[in-house]
């Protein structure tokens, strides 16, 4: 079994998890490739090689392990891209909607992971591009959670003109607009009043950020919809975020968002269930009146 391992943070929890993986009783059947930034960890093992970027990975790999929180998991897709390589997240962070494998149950979980006893679920991505190529050519313009436009260098509202499949729909006077995948519906969009959507739904959510007009509500659309956005306001520029990546874009620039032509494979163990995760993470059903 050929496995790539990544973490964007170096701390004791990450080092402990990494060490546990490399010395696990099933590790002798695996070839491990750890990301270059993990070489600074104190590892008492030598059964691994290093990788630096997505060009070092290929279809011969069986699994990509992300050690950290959901932010680390989002970074992982930049390495995996369109390889159809399952990603499993071992959670050393906080909430963990994507990194669902708990470090407290690590030994049992690793036995299943290293024996390939996991299920795989497809998650859709969003692709973004702009006129005038505002996004660097060497970047990865895809989002597993959301793409958003927000104001920059001003406390004034911006106007986000939005068209769907070539039809003008609305101009959101607001702090910005979130375009979210079903996976991202439990993230930034949810904090701004958006709905929770099952991650395998064929949907996209448009969620305005603090809209001036209270009738500007979140909108759920088909993921086959082509979205066009342009921003105007008192300042000359606004911010475009693609998951954790942020770019400065000139106002009036047309931004296009659509579903990606490839999916991300999310691996889970222990009979993962999205609705159980909702209950655990959002404390649904915990009210004493229930």
Over which residues does each language-model region extend?
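ATP/nucleoside-binding phosphotransfer catalytic cores, i.e., glycine-rich phosphate-binding loops
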Residues: 149, 154, 165-168, 216-290
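Gly/Ser/Thr-rich active-site loops/lids in small-molecule metabolic enzymes
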Residues: 170-174, 179-215
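N-terminal glycine-rich "phosphate-gripper" loop used for MgATP/nucleotide binding
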Residues: 66-70, 77-79
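Short glycine/serine/threonine-rich phosphate/pyrophosphate-binding segments
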Residues: 14-15, 72-76, 186-191
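Short glycine-rich anion-binding loops that position phosphate/pyrophosphate groups of nucleotides
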Residues: 10, 70-72, 95, 183-185
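Catalytic core of DAGKc-family lipid kinases
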Residues: 94-175
